[in-house]
Amino acid sequence: MNDLVISCENLNKVYQDGSNQVAVLKGVDLALQQGEMLAIVGSSGSGKSTLLHILGTLDTATSGSAKIKNQEVAKLSRTEQAAFRNKNLGFIYQFHHLLMEFSAVENVAMPLLIKGLSAKAAKVAALEMLEKVGLAHRSSHKPSALSGGERQRVAIARALVTKPALVLADEPTGNLDKQNAIKIYDLINELNKSLNTSFVVVTHDLELADKLGKIAYLDDGKLTIKESQHVA
């Protein structure tokens, strides 16, 4: 049996709004095996991004347990959380957040340089990952010379170059047209199969969500999980 990459039990998140308390997550239970994929869908303000931030150690739950790779992340210090993120997690956002003054390969190599790899080793690994996302031939181009879909592929390569166990993606195709969005989801499926990386993807698009293995519906702070009808 595969190891659990995510294990959440009775996760609750409450925000204070003046004199009122707003419950965003209510008793969320979630388990994801290494190599599985999950789409999280729900209306605006349903708590999708909040849940993603808790999984990514960027926020903490009010109560309950959230374990990533069997580690209770809330119990780590901020320094330990940063090291944990760098080792185990990759992040993809709606906007690529690439550094515009650097080339594609330099952007992808950045997380490896932060981890302490030599410039040569980081570049080799970055080129290999750009090859996997079909952009090795554009490695020397800066983001301004790339299309929107290409920029997001570079962002995906950057998220995966450290070989994380889990990639968290917040509306990764929200800034793309439908055709390019489908290509990005197909790429995520391909990378999931070839690298055995788990993906949790927040999206508002049910059609795209159905391309992943499981769909989690967040409604009024409660999570319901269903198997996707799509076989990639």
From Swiss-Prot:
Pfam families: ABC_tran. The complex is composed of two ATP-binding proteins (LolD) and two transmembrane proteins (LolC and LolE). Belongs to the ABC transporter superfamily. Lipoprotein translocase (TC 3.A.1.125) family. GO terms for biological process: lipoprotein localization to membrane. Keywords: ATP-binding, Cell inner membrane, Cell membrane, Membrane, Nucleotide-binding, Translocase, Transport. The keyword Translocase applies. Part of the ABC transporter complex LolCDE involved in the translocation of mature outer membrane-directed lipoproteins, from the inner membrane to the periplasmic chaperone, LolA. Responsible for the formation of the LolA-lipoprotein complex in an ATP-dependent manner. The keyword Ligase does not apply. Residues 6-231 form the ABC transporter domain. It is a peripheral membrane protein. GO terms for molecular function: ATP binding; ATP hydrolysis activity. GO terms for cellular component: plasma membrane. It is found in: Cell inner membrane. NCBIfam families: LolD_lipo_ex. Its EC number is 7.6.2.-. Disulfide bonds: none annotated. ATP binds at residues 42-49. It comes from the Bacteria. SMART domains: AAA. This is Lipoprotein-releasing system ATP-binding protein LolD. The lineage of its organism: Bacteria, Pseudomonadati, Pseudomonadota, Gammaproteobacteria, Alteromonadales.
